[in-house]
Amino acid sequence: DALGRGNFYLCGHDRGGRVAHRLAVDHPGRVDRLCLIDIAPTLDMYNATDMRFATAYYHWFHLIQPNPLPETMIGGCAVAYLHAKLGGWGSRGLSYIEPEALIEYERCFCTPEAIHAACEDYRASAGIDLVHDRESRARGDKIACDTQVLWGERGVVQQLFQPLDLWQAQCAGIVSGQALPAGHFIPEELPLETAHALHTFFR
């Protein structure tokens, strides 16, 4: 409303995708089309936790530990931690990131405030967000609009989940999508391909 827009197309990657999912469920009349990048539904991911998932996404369980434990551990080696995350999850290192962009990532992430905010984000995901997701499912709430799902061929979503099936179960509209030849950071690894997929779906 503050932007003066009525209905809109919405796209989110990773945590942005989870926010987009919640927004589309809470305001079904406002989102005309939705694109979710490299996620399965949060509740399904937590419910399917096994050793493979916990190993690949250990940070989901590390970052939710009480403050200040994860903040202190990450803060002691913030650049190394950031590089490990950006270069992992099927991304095959940092070569896909321009040097100037990597410097900016480091500047933005490697502060106590940013690290704490990241941890709080994951704490919310394992806390109030799960409460809302469970309540929504109990009511039968679904995403009303057509939804596109994109995920990386080398990522955890591809390895451990069936994203189209999981999202179709949460959507009243049509779910389509595909795996792209990337790891987790699809927009950065494949910017042109991502833009093409979005343009095709949203036009």
Protein language model regions, located:
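Hydrophobic "lid"/C-terminal helical patch
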Residues: 194, 198, 202
